[in-house]
């Protein structure tokens, strides 16, 4: 096993500011409130006309959307779908990995408790109306990075855990619905 190497985050990814130039009649607008703890919550198409000025950024599959505002609110998402007609708010960083890091590995690093705490502390240290970070501040954070093969093993392991957590949530939701149905049948 090779030794892990230290990198600044800016050495393994870029912030993407590609303006959406598509001409689809309908698009999906993604704001900071539409991403949470890894998921993109909004997939509702709206008419592509008179769009508010904040919706400009194009993104694609395997990109990471990360809110510039209040990192501790966990407003980030890994894009695991084709996003041709999706447009992100300018308050979301679009982060794209390079060939040194797997996109999902980078996502796991950026959403880790330790990284979120560091970014929140940086955000709170800035003057302004609300805690905010920039890609420049993110880019100088250092991480230890294994070789790609090891990253793949780590991602597989973490995805397995995430799948089990998601399954448990679905089971809990189902049990809650069953309990409510029983309660209604007994007491209503």
Name every feature range the model reports, one short phrase each:
Residues 1-20, 144-188:
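Non-catalytic DNA-recognition/assembly elements of restriction-modification systems
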Residues 9, 39, 88, 102, ...:
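N-terminal alpha-helical segment
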Residues 78-79, 124-126:
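Short amphipathic beta-strand starts and helix->beta connectors
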Residues 86-92, 126-155:
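A short glycine-rich beta-alpha junction/loop motif
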Residues 6-64, 79:
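Sequence-specific dsDNA recognition surfaces
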Residues 32, 97, 143:
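Active-site donor-binding loop signature of nucleotide-sugar glycosyltransferases
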């Amino acid at each position: 096993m090779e030794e892990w190497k230290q990198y600044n985050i800016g050495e393994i990814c870029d912030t993407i500011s590609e303006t959406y130039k598509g001409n689809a009649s309908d698009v999906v607008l993604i704001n900071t409130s539409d991403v949470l703890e890894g998921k993109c919550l909004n997939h509702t198409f709206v008419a592509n006309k008179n769009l508010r000025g904040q919706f400009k950024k194009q993104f694609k599959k395997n990109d990471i959307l990360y809110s510039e505002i209040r990192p501790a609110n966990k407003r980030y998402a890994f894009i695991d779908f084709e996003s041709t007609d999706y447009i992100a708010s300018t308050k979301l960083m679009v982060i794209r990995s390079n060939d040194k890091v797997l996109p999902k590995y980078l996502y796991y690093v950026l959403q880790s408790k330790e990284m979120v705490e560091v970014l929140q502390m940086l955000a709170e240290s800035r003057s302004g109306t609300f805690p905010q970070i920039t890609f420049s501040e993110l880019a100088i954070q250092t991480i230890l990075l294994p070789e790609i093969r090891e990253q793949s093993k780590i991602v597989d392991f973490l995805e397995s855990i995430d799948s089990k957590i998601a399954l448990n949530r679905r089971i809990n939701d189902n049990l809650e619905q069953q309990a409510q149905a029983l309660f209604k049948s007994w007491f209503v």
